[in-house]
Amino acid sequence: ATGWSMGAIQAFHWAASYPDRVERLAPFAGTAKTWPHNIVLIEGIRAALQADVAWNNGQYTAPPEVGLRTLGRVYASWGFSQPFYREECYKALGYETLSEFISGFWEESFVPSDANDLLAMMWTWQHADISQNDRYKGDFETALRSIQARTVVMPVRTDLYFTPEDSEYETKHIPNATFKPIESIWGHLAGFGLNPVDTAFINNTLKELLGTN
């Protein structure tokens, strides 16, 4: 099981829920539950979207575009790291200025989305926890210890919300796990396939994991 971001949360969920069936686990830029600082991010982007009067408590007749664009601008400070912006890495994505990047990349990423779909995703993300079920009854460390898969946990060193510190804590409680950070300044989006160097690191790690006995 593998996945990025919320896909990583899902991968952890499969490995904990079906420990006898998942033989390899490789979550990247994601954790086994949503930790408090991550929840702070979600509360902020939710508020940005819902502040648009056009959202109308979810009963909108047209997309709340102002709220969607504002959400994108708020997210811009979280998705990539400080050194990403300092070193102007956005130019590698075809944007000449910071302003162009914020509007062209971040705003336009969210404008096509349905607002209520995004809010449903945020709720799922905020409440993610592999131990919140009848099997583990909230015992998070027991849920982690139950994972039998050969595991490689790949946080991004500069991820601002699925932090490497949270991932390292989780890795220590998984019996057969290796902590292997993605050493990148592309923040959370190092796992999104935008930077070839980061993508190659992930691909090579997956190949190594699948090749082990």
PLM regions and their residue ranges:
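Short beta-strand/loop motif that positions the catalytic acidic residue
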Residues: 147, 153-155
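Conserved alpha/beta-hydrolase "acid-adjacent" motif
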Residues: 136, 160-166
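Short glycine-enriched nucleophile-adjacent loop
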Residues: 8-19, 25
